[in-house]
């Protein structure tokens, strides 16, 4: 996963430059750290100028900065990128992880509903729903006005249609 998101950052940087867009933040889900590690490396290596903001999907993911730094450093070394980082340089946001892995809370479900009803874009309850919830809150309450932020939808749509998640969403919005 890390290498794919490393090259995704190259493409994103190219598109931002072509369109003369200058956001400050890139918000995305963070689980096993491959996505975040690749984006961090790509942002630095390709000088994209974005601060990558990983939103954890599991509240038990505390102290993930140490393994993330290890993955970043090993990937950089393996591919000769010449980049290193320390755990102190990384900040994984645990504020929106909810009750547990694959357990959406009411705030996550509401964020899912907002995005689906306003933009016809679906996010899943495990990963992208939680990170989109974080994105909404960060843009509205944390990031400085005018800084600009990108939300990266990393997939996960099939999780919406599991019986557990369907029942939960139906109970919340249609009963």
Enumerate the predicted regions with their spans.
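General beta-strand structural signal in soluble alpha/beta enzymes
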Residues: 28, 122-125, 151
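Active-site-adjacent helical/loop segments in soluble small-molecule enzymes
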Residues: 87-146
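Short, high-confidence coil segments that cap the C-terminus of an alpha-helix
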Residues: 21-23, 144-147
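Glycine-rich phosphate/pyrophosphate-binding loop at beta-loop-alpha junctions
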Residues: 2-91, 153-175
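Compositionally biased, low-complexity repeat tracts
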Residues: 130, 151-152
